[in-house]
Structure formats: structure tokens, C-alpha cells
């Protein structure tokens, strides 16, 4: 679990995810503030149902995306590419995620947007601080970690 621990530690320090969905061959990307749950290996975001990405996702859909910093030096590049599934949360599951999200982003208390979970199934973490092009991969299906 060393790979997942390193990835989780880095993701916990970031706050913006780019997510991409598709519907009938049409692609769309969006940015959102996220809360990362290391135990569930999932992001939680708030987004209105009327947004294009939510409309294309429906209640549940495949998703891919990235999280990255903005370093000015190639040697400091770090970032995640992922694929997984996005779904709108309901009921108690939504309430629990919203409470945690509001702790991370207190201003979100004023928003009524639904809570969505992005369950990560594959993560590739590039970390040039460990050496140029250093990559770590985590796969949910097999618990596999590659360095």
C-alpha cells in the first residue's frame, strides 16, 4: 500500500480536480473543488445537476480526469491521471459526504448543489521530484501497485 499512501498524501494537499465525461461520443471536462477520501479512494465534489458534465453523467457514468499542481520547473512536476465512476449520492451517504466536504470548504455550507462521488479505479501518479518521469500506478481491481 506504499504507492496508494504516497498518492493519497499528495491528493490530500490539493483541492481542484479536472473530470471528463462522455455521452454518445461527445466529451466534456469540468473543474471542481474536491475532498479526497483515502479509505474509499474517492473524490467528493459538489455540482449542480444542470451543469453540462452532470447532465452527461446522469445518475452514474464512467469518468476520467487529472489533478495537478502548477510548478514552473519540470523537475517539480507532480500529478495524477485517473479513471473511475462518478455517481450522484443520495440520502445518508450524501449527508455524510457533505458534512466532510463542508469541513474542508466551509463556504460550501451556503451551496445546495448535490454531492457526487468519483470512485477511482485506476490512478497513475507522476512525481518528478523522485526522478524524471517517475510513475506509480494503483489499480482497485487487483490492489496492484507498480512503481
Curated annotation (Swiss-Prot):
SUPFAM superfamilies: FMN-binding split barrel
UniProt superkingdom: Bacteria
Coiled coil residues, start to end: none
NCBIfam families: PRK03467.1 (NF002900)
Family per record: Belongs to the UPF0306 family.
Full protein name: UPF0306 protein YhbP
